[in-house]
Design a protein with these regions (language model features):
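Acidic beta-strand-to-loop metal/phosphate-binding motif
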Residues: 117, 152-166, 185
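Short, surface-exposed amphipathic charged segments that create phosphate/polyanion-binding patches used
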Residues: 66-67, 146-152, 191-207
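A generic structural motif
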Residues: 135, 181-190
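A residue-level signal for conserved active-site and pocket-lining positions in enzyme catalytic cores
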Residues: 40, 76, 157, 192
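Phosphate-handling DNA/RNA-contact segment within nucleic-acid enzymes
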Residues: 59-154
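Short, aromatic/basic amphipathic alpha-helical patches
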Residues: 165-178
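TOPRIM metal-binding catalytic domain and adjacent DNA-binding surface shared by DnaG-type primases
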Residues: 1-68, 72-75, 109, 149, ...
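Phosphate- and divalent-cation-binding pockets in alpha/beta enzyme and binding domains
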Residues: 126-127, 166, 191-192
Length: 221
């Protein structure tokens, strides 16, 4: 079920999680939940992260055999969710047929601190204050872009190396609106899930601010 409420002349998307959704953070683990829990553990998810992000799974229904990661808006309502298979289904991701123009897990973002823009939801759970762009080009009309411009936090960007052109377009638009942007150099052939916490912190500390005078050179590399 999708509902909407008008706020600042904008419709806030609210949806329901699948009826079959079961949480993986309650401490009550049965045979069905052990398999998705093992999958998350192998991917480096601690119990604290599973609890914080309210990660669950579905053992039946449309999302059978899938991990469910909900997104909560700033009021605590579910605005979206991502589902990823933990079995050998050919289709890795299957998400609800609703708009992705949201700030994923806005409820958990501290806009007074630096944010990090990343590609996908699993990347965003790597560290605090990471926001996935969900495949978006982050145009000026998107909710996430407008919120970044409004709050103007120090902004890091760490997209996959194969998304370089899209990354530069996003950086260019943000700089145009006066947002300070630092580029984290993700190693070729890797994404954030392949990088240790120590390595990520090192890359973040050495990230360089992108300015107009260097942007043209970077775009034409």
């Amino acid at each position: 079920i999708i509902t909407g409420s008008a706020s600042n002349e904008k419709i806030k998307q609210k949806i329901d999680l699948p009826e079959e959704y079961k949480p993986l953070f309650t401490g009550s683990i049965d045979l069905y939940s052990q398999i998705p829990l093992n999958y998350l553990t192998k991917r480096g998810f601690s119990h604290d992260k599973i609890y914080k992000y309210k990660i669950g799974y579905c053992a039946s229904g449309e999302y059978k055999g899938r991990i469910i990661i909900p997104s909560f808006d700033e009021e605590g309502d579910v605005s979206y969710f991502v589902s990823r298979t933990y079995t050998k289904q050919k289709r890795k991701y299957k998400n609800p047929r609703v708009s992705k123009d949201i700030v994923f897990n806005d409820l958990l973002i501290d806009w007074q601190k630096p944010i990090v823009l990343v590609e996908g939801v699993f990347d965003s759970i790597h560290e605090e204050n990471m926001i996935p762009i969900l495949g978006s080009t982050l145009s000026e009309k998107t909710e996430l872009f407008q919120k970044i411009v409004e709050k103007s936090p120090k902004t890091y960007i760490a997209l996959d190396p194969d998304a370089y052109k899209k990354e530069m377009n996003i950086v260019s638009n943000l700089i145009k609106y006066g947002v300070g942007v630092w580029k984290i150099e993700v190693p070729e052939g890797k994404d954030l899930n392949d990088i240790s916490k120590y390595e990520y912190q090192r890359l973040k500390m050495t990230a360089k601010q992108v300015k107009f005078d260097t942007l043209f050179e970077m775009i034409n590399i």
